Amino acid sequence: MNSLITIKNVGVSYAMQPHVLKDCNATIEGPTITGIIGPNGAGKSTLLKAILGLIQSSGKILIDGESPKKVLHKIAYVEQKSQIDFTFPITIRECVALGRTVKKKPFQRLTKEDWAKVDAAIEEVGLTDLASRQIGALSGGQFQRVLLARCMVQEAEYIFLDEPFVGIDMLSEKVIMTIIRKWKEEGKTILMVNHDLSKVKEYFDQVILVKHAIVASGKTEDVFIKKYLDDVYGGSVYIPQGGEQHA
């Protein structure tokens, strides 16, 4: 089933910081892997949170024709690791199981089938041997894999990821990207904030280029070009033919 996110004239302002985002317009048709890219402080994470309905915004955001708050059951969200309390005394298995509780009614216990899905997700991210380990003892890459396993058991149609590759090892990045591609094959729509430009063409089907507004959006090959990147990064991005991109 095709999915659709519509962003119309969206803006975000704060009392001490007006126009964090203004006049944002884009359409995301899924299944797809879409990257939100732009320089530091450009409003990438703010846009993601606005689409989720986590912060107040002007304009209109629709997910499958509904407001975000009406379709929260379709969405899984992984925030930046810097915003998560690693000291909370919980194991990998318990953390992943929290994702399954969103499928249940209040105070409804997890069933054997639920726990089987939890264990299968932990196995898929390669952490079965560590399932009883406290999350505070994990590396950044291991913990990010735990968060993706938690998304798996939610069985959401939309996956929103805020900087999932920051501070992780290459193995974890490979595991995570394999899972993300599998999600797309299953018909899911993934929207991901990303500051690293080196793998934009490899990772994303579509790109939203942000600098306090949506400068351009669409297929990666149409947006990730010198014309738009110069507008956003001030000419500091070098794009060699067939090579990597550097800011």
Where does each model-flagged region fall?
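A short, flexible loop at the N-terminus of ABC-type nucleotide-binding domains that lies
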Residues: 1-23, 85
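Conserved ABC transporter NBD signature motif
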Residues: 59-71
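Conserved ABC ATPase "signature" region
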Residues: 111-130
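Conserved ABC ATPase signature
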Residues: 134-138, 142
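Catalytic Walker B motif of ABC-type/P-loop ATPase nucleotide-binding domains
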Residues: 159-163
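H-loop/switch region of ABC-family ATPase nucleotide-binding domains
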Residues: 194-195
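Conserved switch/coupling elements of ABC/ABC-like ATPase nucleotide-binding domains
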Residues: 208, 212-222
